[in-house]
Amino acid sequence: MATSNLLKNKGSLQFEDKWDFMRPIVLKLLRQESVTKQQWFDLFSDVHAVCLWDDKGPAKIHQALKEDILEFIKQAQARVLSHQDDTALLKAYIVEWRKFFTQCDILPKPFCQLEITLMGKQGSNKKSNVEDSIVRKLMLDTWNESIFSNIKNRLQDSAMKLVHAERLGEAFDSQLVIGVRESYVNLCSNPEDKLQIYRDNFEKAYLDSTERFYRTQAPSYLQQNGVQNYMKYADAKLKEEEKRALRYLETRRECNSVEALMECCVNALVTSFKETILAECQGMIKRNETEKLHLMFSLMDKVPNGIEPMLKDLEEHIISAGLADMVAAAETITTDSEKYVEQLLTLFNRFSKLVKEAFQDDPRFLTARDKAYKAVVNDATIFKLELPLKQKGVGLKTQPESKCPELLAIYCDMLLRKTPLSKKLTSEEIEAKLKEVLLVLKYVQNKDVFMRYHKAHLTRRLILDISADSEIEENMVEWLREVGMPADYVNKLARMFQDIKVSEDLNQAFKEMHKNNKLALPADSVNIKILNAGAWSRSSEKVFVSLPTELEDLIPEVEEFYKKNHSGRKLHWHHLMSNGIITFKNEVGQYDLEVTTFQLAVLFAWNQRPREKISFENLKLATELPDAELRRTLWSLVAFPKLKRQVLLYEPQVNSPKDFTEGTLFSVNQEFSLIKNAKVQKRGKINLIGRLQLTTERMREEENEGIVQLRILRTQEAIIQIMKMRKKISNAQLQTELVEILKNMFLPQKKMIKEQIEWLIEHKYIRRDESDINTFIYMA
């Protein structure tokens, strides 16, 4: 019954019944006059009632609002247009606009029901959006048609003049410019792009006036003040313009006005003078003017391709300055590996400091530093290592390479071996210096050379038991693994330490077994090292030497003991790697001499005839040593650098071991002694092994040939690995991937790559594509 009464009464309430109550409140809101809470609620209620009960009510409300809004705007228009002066016009407009724009957010709120009725919007389903309100749109469209569209150009010009004046240092109310911007942003009637009018007018005018200003100002400032002062000016103006843009331009997310303005400023202030500014870069780098370089970097980083010339200048400086410093110190560093490494580290730290302070460790500049420093480290100008071009000595040609990896290995040896250097350093200091070596090693192209030399030095330290700190030795192996050294190489080093530990247990067992037995030598005086051939990879060359009887008799005992514990394994004796301590007695005193097996064999020739002179020819018969090894060994006993009185004497005198003849006579120096502080010592110990290599001349040649041979094998393996995965690949891509695989060991030369590709084609591992000779196909 109630429902039918409602339907029956629909239409009984008319728009005219309510508008007289609604209109005074609407006019008060337009004029920014205060309304009571009750009036505010009544307006909501009356709008709702008219929209609900009068079918034509919504349209009538809309029309009535339009008339009142238009009337209000005409009054505002009259107040604005009463000013003829553009600045006065702008100020008057902004006063009226700000009041009106505020009411654009307030007046639409009571008319929500009007929105629902006219537009079909459901307030219950969608959040009310004042910006989409038809009342707000009505207000803004009417303002645009009545006032803004007629005077917008005058307003815009006035706003731009104010911005220009601000650039020249004059102050004004920033709201005058902001109000013009707001008008453009909010008075656009295009629903698809609400910023269209703003972009086409205000933003364009702002950007054009900015560009005109700096196209005039910048060249004259540069001419009057020079490049370095101009950079400060440009930097200050860019920061100033960014702050100004954030005030005067639209900053909503979908608008990129600020970015467009900054691009415009960069073009006018920096890009136009790019070449002039960059011309100063090289000199600044040479003079280490980091603050100025940082300023240049911050400017050029805003310009397309602005950084590239700076990177090139940095690279050229590092290479030229680095090599110049190395050449200047060549006399010292070529003979002193410690000074060499210190020099390289000094250069690295100097260039790193430059990159940090001037370029804030920007990755592009770090890459340029690394590239240039790598060129310095791998330069072969000052000193070089000659490697044979072909394997197994086909031809005598050699290829020069940087001696850096060899010198790094020597320096590591000085730190890891018992030397004056390692003795004066703490464990922490040794570790720090080794880490510095690893830093330089990162830039070495041919790491395989370092590996070879490092392993040779490690072999010597382990065999002679002259490591300064066994814990650091083993840590070094792991550090090499961490810096990306090939796993097979690092694993062999680890196996070497394992062999030494196993040998210690074997020695203990051997001594236990023979503690009550009578051997040629007491078991306690013998230290046996059983080494794995694969890990230690010693030369296949066997150097025969006639051992003293005591040693000859001991060897079968050791072999028998080992076979009992490890059946099926065969021992190969490497006398070249062996050493011992012998006691030397004469009229002066008694001394312990640390000697190689070869030195021992030579000295034992006098054991039964201590005062005789023995010729070179007879010593060769007695020791059965090869000629070259005998000469080298004798020279170490007649011209040992650390001794003032040598162990052996000889006649006639010669300048080098090569000058010994068959008739050169050698004898034991009966006055041999150790001299300390100008006093003869009656007892003492001296190491005669010194830097005498535990390798033969031929073995050293094999080491270098082995490096080349291993490179060839590694190159072949890598090509096969790539071809298996790719199946088909171009020559250029193959070379790129090959370098990537091998870079942690060595940098393969194009000639070597070409030769190995041809070898693999010849042996049917790969073939050329019939349609393209520069493409290779894998043959399973």
Swiss-Prot record:
Any one Gene Ontology MF annotation carried by this entry is:
ubiquitin ligase complex scaffold activity
Alphabetically sorted, this entry's keywords are: Isopeptide bond, Nucleus, Phosphoprotein, Ubl conjugation, Ubl conjugation pathway
Task: PTM Phosphothreonine: list the residues.
Answer: 210
Glycyl lysine isopeptide (Lys-Gly) (interchain with G-Cter in NEDD8) crosslink residues? 724
Per UniProt, subcellular location reads as: Nucleus
| One GO term (biological process) | proteasomal protein catabolic process
List every position bearing Phosphoserine.
34
Q: Which Gene3D superfamilies does UniProt cross-reference here?
A: Cullin Repeats, Cullin, Chain C, Domain 2, Winged helix-like DNA-binding domain superfamily/Winged helix DNA-binding domain
Can you supply one Gene Ontology CC term for this chain's record?
nucleus
Q: Which domain of life is it from?
A: Eukaryota
- Keyword Transcription part of the UniProt annotation: no
Cullin neddylation domain: residues covered: 711-772
**What pathway annotation does it carry?**
Protein modification; protein ubiquitination
Subunit composition? Component of multiple cullin-5-RING E3 ubiquitin-protein ligase complexes (ECS complexes, also named CRL5 complexes) formed of CUL5, Elongin BC (ELOB and ELOC), RNF7/RBX2 and a variable SOCS box domain-containing protein as substrate-specific recognition component. CUL5-containing ECS complexes specifically contain RNF7/RBX2, and not RBX1, as catalytic subunit. Component of the ECS(ASB2) complex with the substrate recognition component ASB2. Component of the ECS(ASB6) complex with the substrate recognition component ASB6.
Functional summary from the UniProt entry: Core component of multiple cullin-5-RING E3 ubiquitin-protein ligase complexes (ECS complexes, also named CRL5 complexes), which mediate the ubiquitination and subsequent proteasomal degradation of target proteins. Acts a scaffold protein that contributes to catalysis through positioning of the substrate and the ubiquitin-conjugating enzyme. The functional specificity of the E3 ubiquitin-protein ligase complex depends on the variable SOCS box-containing substrate recognition component.
Indicate the family of this protein.
Belongs to the cullin family.
- Its protein name is Cullin-5
